[in-house]
Amino acid sequence: MERDGNLKPWGSLFCKTAETVVQRFYKRQLLNDIKSYMQIKQLLLVILLILFHNQQLVAQQNATQKFSGTVSSDDGLPIPGATVKIGEYIRVTDNKGEFSFDQIIPKSYTISIVYIGFKPIRKSITIGEKQKNRIEFVMDATTHELKNVDVVGRTKVTEVNRQAFNVTALDATKMHNSTLDIAGALDRVAGVRVRETGGLGSNFNLSLNGFSGNHIRFFLDGVPMDNFGSSFQINNIPINIAERIEVYKGVVPMWLGADALGGAVNIVTGDRFRNYIDVSYSIGSFNTHRSVINAAATSKSGFTVQLNAFQNFSDNNYKVTVDASDINTGQYSPGTRVKRFHDQYHNETVIANVGVVDKSFADKLLFGVTLGQNYKEIQTGARMVSVFGQWHRRGNMIMPTLKYQKKDLIKGLDLNFNANYNFGKEQNIDTAYRRYDWFGNYKQYEGKGSERTRTMYKYGNNAGLATTMLNYKLNDNHSFALSNVFSTFDRKGSDEINPSNNAYEQKQKTNKNILGLGYMFNTADHWSLNLFSKYIIQNSIVGQQNLNQTTTQSQFGYGLATSYNFNRNLQLKASYEKANRMPEATEIFGDVENFEGNSNLKPEVSDNVNVGLMYSFSLQDVNRFSISANAIYRNASNFIYYQFNQNQSKLVAGNRDGVTNFGGDIEARYSFKDWLTAGVNVTYQNIINQQEYEGNPPVLSPVYKDRMPNIPFLYGNGDVAFSFKNVGKKGNNLSFGYNLLYVHAFYLYWPSRGTSGDKYGIPKQLSHDVNLLYSLKNGRYNISAECKNLNDALLYDNFSLQKPSRAFYLKLRYFINKTA
Amino acid sequence: MKSTLKNACYAMALIAGISSCSKDKSNDLISENKGNYILTVTPVASTGVADYLLTADNLESGTLSTAGNGLEQDGTFRYYVTTNNKFFSMLYGQGNPGAVTTYNIQNGKLSKLSNFQTETVQAFAPVNNDLLLVKIPRTYGNKANWYQVDTDKLLITSEGQLDVANLTGNGETAHFSWLKQVNNKVFAPYFSIKACCADGFGTNYPDSAWVAVYDYPSMKLEKIIKDNRTSFIGRYFVDGLGVLENGDTYAFSSSVATTGGVFSSKKPSAITRINAGTTEFDQNYYFNFQDASGGMNITNWIYIGGGNFVVNATTAAEKGAYNTGVHIGIVNVNNKTFKAVTGMPDLDKIGSVTDHNFTPKDGRTAYMGVTLKDGSSFVYKIDAVTATATQGLKVEGGTITSISKL
C-alpha cells in the first residue's frame, strides 16, 4: 500500500494511474525499494483493501489451480507493487516481485500487468492442468509518459479513500514543494477545520466534523502521537516528512489502536527509497525560515540509516488591526494597525533511525531517537486586548524508539512492534512583572509578579508507549488482527522560583491499555465487511493530600465497516462504532498552570454512524469527474469539555450529557487531460447541544437543542491547478495553483440568545492562496513561490485573534535518490 | 453513458437523502422591555456562555426573555456595578486585561458610552466619584495592584501597589474578600491564604478576621484590625460589610476557611461591628448567626436600611466556600434577630439565587433573583417587615446574575 499502483480496483477510473512529475522521477528507484518494509498499519490496510476490493470470486468449482509468477524489470530487478490481473482476479506483487493466485478456475484468460513507468504487459494465457503454473514476466521501462491522469490528483491515496471507513487520504508528495505544514494540508480536507490562534507555531485546534481537541487522535505511522510533546506536533511538522496523510472522520479502524472518539489523523511517512536525499529550504515574510532534510542510506547487506531533520523559525511579526489601549489610562484607540512584537517561534527536530532490513529474523529492526526542542513567545491572551511582551514557553523531546517488523512468522502471520519513551520536558515562563501595550511600551511593577500567572514550572510527562500488532491472513476471504497499545504517563515537575511547590507535588500517574480484535471478510467483489472491538482499561493514581487515590476504569467498544460496489465507478460505504475515550492525563491531573485536574471524570462514549458514497465518470476520456459524499451522525454522552473552575482562574474538564452532530461533506473534482485539475468541497455540520440540565444544582438549560456556538458549521475549499510539461527544456515542468478557503460566519456565543444585531461573532473568512512551481531535471531541482492570503483579508479562526496578513514564501528543494 | 446517468441518479438521490434531514428551531421573540431596571442574565450552559443585559420598568410583574433579546456581553463571569448614574460591565478575564463597557440609560434603553481597558480584578467598589479596582495575587510574594477609574472621564487616573505579603503577619498572603468605602476610608477585609501549590486558597489560620484600612485616594495602609471571635469576613468575591445610616459598619463571617480542602474554622458564622468613627472591632457586639438561625451560615447579604439585612444562608450540610445559600432570612443587626422568609419557592425547586440584588434602601424591600430547576427565573420581592417573599417579574432563558437600577 505504500507504493504507487498497488491494489487499484481494476478498470476503475482510479486505476488509470496518474503519473506526476515526482512519481515519474521515482520510477526507476522504486525498483530498489523492493524489500522495504511495510508499516503494520499499512500492511493491515493492504489486507483490508484486498478484502474490500479484491475481485476474486469464491471458487465455485473444485478444480481450481494455483498460478504464480514473478515480475521483474528489463534490468533484472524485481518490481514490487505491480498489479497483475487475470480475468476478474487481481494480485499485487510483493517485495520480491512475486504474485500468486491460489484458486483459479482453469481456462483461457488475458493476463495484464501494469506498473508506473513500464510498458503494460497484456497477453493471453491458458491456465489448465497441463499448463505450467508459474511464469516469469519482464517489463520494459517506458520512455514515453503515461497519458492517463487521475481526476483526483491523489493516485496513491485513492485506495485508502476507498476503504469502508469514512476516510480521506491526502497525497503529501504532491505538496512537497509547498511551504505547508501538516496542519495547513489538513485544512484543505473536507470536514476538517484547523483553527489557529496566530502565525507559525501558534496553538491550533483541529476539528473533524465538529469534534476537536482530545477527541481527535494523531498518529505517526500508526503509532499514537499523544506523548510527543510540543516539539513534534502537526503545526510544526513540515509536509515533506509525510508521504500521505489519512483522515478518519468518525469511525476509527481498529488497527489505529487508540481511544479516539471523534476521528483520527494518521501521518504516513513511508520509506519509499532506500537511498535518497531530499533537502528543502524556504524563506518568507515575517522572517520565516524553514528547512527540511530527509535522507536514507541502505547497504546491500541491509544495514540502514535514516534521518529526518527539520527546522522552523518565524518572528510572526505580521501586522494586525487592534483596539490599542493606552497603557496608563486604559483608553482605546480603535482600529490601530500595529506589528506583533513578541511572537517568535522556532523549533528544531531530528529523527534518526539505525537498523537492519530484510534479515531472516526481521524484515525491519530499527533503533531510533527523536530529539526536538521548541521556543514560543506568547503575544496575546484569549483576546487581542491582552498583550504580553515576555511570557514564553519552551519544550523539548528526547524520545528513543524501537521498531520491529516480521512477516510470515508462521505462514500468514505478521508481527509488528513499536515502542517509545519520551523524556522531554515542558516549561512555561512568566516572571516579568510588567504590563505591555500594543506598541511594545511597558510598565514595570515592583516585586515578584508576572504578566499573567507567575511560574517557571517545568515538568516531564515521562510518557511511554508500546504497540503490538498481529495480523493473520487465513485465506483470501478471512483475516484476523489483534492489536495492543499500552501507554504510561507519570508526571513529575518542579518550579525553581517556587521550590516549596515541590513539597506539594502529588502523584500523577496513569497506565492505559487498549486491546483490539478485528475480523475482516469479503465475499466477492461487491461487498466487504470489517468487524472490530476494543477493550480499554485505564488505571490512574491521583495524589490527594497525603494519600493516593487509585481509579480503574474500563470500557468495551465495537464497530463495523462495510462497503458495497454497485459497479466499478460507484461505491457505497457505511460504518458504525461504539467509541470510547478515557479521560486524558491532563484532564485528570491538570497541568499545574492553566488547567485544573478532575479525577472524577468518566469515560466518554459515543455512537458514530458514517455513510459514504464515491462516484466517478468520464466524458470522452479527457474530462474526468469524481464525486464523493459523506454523511455523519454522532451522539456523544459524558462528553468531556472544558470550563472555568470555581474561582475562574483555570480551566477544568467535566462531563456533559453530550452533543449530537448530523452533517456531511461533499467533494467534487474535475480534470481535463493531464494539465488541468480543479476541485471543490463543502462541509456542513449541525452540532446540537443535548445537555438538558446544567449547573449545580441542575436547572433546565435554555440552550438545550441549540446549535453549539463558536464552532464553524459551514465551510469549504476550492482549488485549481494547471501544469505544463517541458517548459523551457525537456524535463522541466511548470505548474500554477490556486486555493480558496471559505468559512461561513458563526456566532461566538449561543445563537438563540440576545438581540441579533448586537451579537459577537467570527465573520466570514475568504482567503486566496496562489502558488507557482518550476521543477527542473524531472524534479531534481524545484523552485516554488507562494502567496498566502493574497487579498490581505483580516482572517480570524478564533474570536478577535487575527491570523497572518498577506505573506510571500519562496522554497527551494533538491531531491535525488540513488541505486544502492 | 446510460449507466453513467443511472449512477449519477443514484448518487444524487443519496446526497439529497442525506442532506434533507435538518430542522430549524424558531424562537418566540419577546420585544425588549424598556425601563430603568437592569437585569443581567446568563443562559445556563457549560460553554460559549455570554451574559445578556435586559431592561425592565418594574420588577414585580411581567415577563422578559433572552431568546432573540438582550444586549450580548463579551462572555460570562462578568461583574456589574452602578455608580455615578452609569452601569459598568466588567469582564473577569482569567488574569488577562479586558475591556470594561459602560452604559447609561436613555429613554429606558441601555446606551453604550465607551470602552476602556482594565486588568482583571478580584474586588471593586465605588469610592467618591471613582471606581476603585484591586487586582489580588494568588502567588506568595506578589503585590496587589489598585486602579482608580474616574467615572466621569471613564479612564484610569491613578494606580499603585499594595503589599499583601506582609499584612497577615503569619507568613501567609492576604486576599481581599471585598472593598468598601466607610466614611473617607477604604475598608478591605481579607482572608489569609497559603498562596502556594496544591492548597493555594487554604490557610493555617482559619480562626481570625482582618480588615485593612486604607486612606483614600492615597491608598496608604493606615491600620490592620483583627478579631479572633470569627473567621474571616466576607468570602471570595463577596462583600461582607454593611454600613448603616449611623455610620456603624457590620461584618459577617461565613466561617468557610479551609485547610487542605476541609473546613477548618472552629468559629461559628457570626456578625461583628466596627463603630462609626472608629477602626476597631466593637468587642461588646457579637451576634452568633449560627445559633440564631439553627445552625446555618451566611453566604451573602444585602443591606436594605433600618438595620435590616436580607441574608442568604446555607445549612451545615450545604456549606461550601463558593455557593450562595438558598435559605433567605431577615437579620436585624440592632436587635440581633433572625427571621426566616416565607413565600419563597420550595427548596427542592430552587436551582440558584442571585447574589447581586437590588434594594431601594427603604428599610423594608429587596428584589432577589431566583432560578428554578425547571429553568425559569423570577424576581422575588422580599418584605423584611412581614418576612415574606412574593413572586414578581419572570425571566426566561437564563439565570439572573444581578439586578440593578439606574
Model-derived segments and spans:
Chain B
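Beta-propeller blade signature
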Residues: 52-57, 100-102, 143-154, 201-220, ...
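Short beta-strand elements that form the blades of beta-propeller/WD-repeat-like
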Residues: 33-45, 83-93, 128-140, 185-192, ...
